[in-house]
A protein has these predicted regions:
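Short, Lys/Arg-rich N-terminal segment immediately upstream of the first membrane anchor
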Residues: 1-6
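Compositionally biased intrinsically disordered regions enriched in Thr/Gly
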Residues: 7-259
Length: 259
């Protein structure tokens, strides 16, 4: 048999293997189904200045490895959002138990200090982006549990579609240094168009540590979204700061990009 024929057969086999593998992945991912879970709670027999909790999160249907890991992570995140006033994170408490604890704590405080303003928690989750290897979920959150100001935040979570494991920031990109350099440019552009003051020699508002990526980073179709909590930039900041980096510039370094 000629070498060219063997080579062609090898290429054909490789192509068929990729097609079969791709079709199998498509069938698996197309079977993933999500449902929205909505929970609304308020203080019983309350007419004015009432505690309010609004939760909208996703649950993956079925019993696949992805569904089990995804649902466990979401359960943990929502429960800890409800228990955000506690000192330590919980990993084995249900959302219902956490909700009962939150409302009970508020009712106990309100009983002794009826003049306190009503607490309010809002959480809304949605899938922001997905390819054949991963998906990004965004959780928009609002929390007022006393104090001077309410807290608004975004939490992005990335899931590997083959098993539902969380993709950490450290594993999100193949070259974090290059992504950081690209992000730094867009941070500066966004900063110059905002009211953030210049604090250090590089022209950024970081407290002596230099520019760095935030803890919360989200992927959308068009942008890598960098969501900086106030304390991540400077101690004097009282509001979050969002930077959008064109996805086309960082896509080459995405660990879970399409083949």
């Amino acid at each position: 048999m000629k070498k060219s024929s063997v080579k062609k057969r090898g290429i054909l086999c490789s192509v068929l293997s990729l097609l079969i593998s791709g079709y199998s992945l498509y069938r698996y991912f197309s079977k993933l189904r999500f449902e929205e879970v909505a929970i609304e709670r308020s203080t019983d027999n309350c007419e004015d200045n009432c505690l309010s909790v609004s939760l909208n999160y996703l649950r993956c249907k079925g019993n696949s490895e992805f569904a089990q890991n995804f649902n466990k992570e979401i359960e943990t995140q929502v429960a800890n959002f409800l228990l955000s006033n506690e000192d330590t994170l919980q990993v084995d408490v249900s959302i219902e138990k956490a909700l009962e604890s939150f409302m009970s704590d508020y009712n106990n405080i309100h009983e002794h200090f009826p003049e306190i303003p009503a607490y309010e928690l809002i959480l809304s989750d949605s899938i922001m982006w997905q390819n054949s290897k991963m998906l990004t979920l965004v959780s928009n959150r609002y929390s007022f549990t006393g104090g001077a100001n309410a807290v608004q935040s975004k939490v992005f979570t990335h899931f590997a579609l083959d098993n539902g494991e969380v993709i950490t920031n450290e594993n999100l990109f193949t070259d974090e240094a290059k992504v950081t350099a690209i992000a730094e440019k867009y941070f500066k552009q966004t900063q110059e168009a905002s009211v953030i003051e210049v604090l250090d020699d590089k022209g950024f508002g970081f407290d002596g540590n230099g520019f760095h990526l935030p803890k919360s980073m989200g992927i959308s179709a068009d942008y890598l979204i960098l969501f900086y909590e106030p304390f991540e930039i400077a101690s004097y900041m009282d509001a979050a700061f969002e930077v959008k980096v064109p996805m086309k510039e960082v896509m080459p370094y995405l660990t879970f990009k399409e083949d």
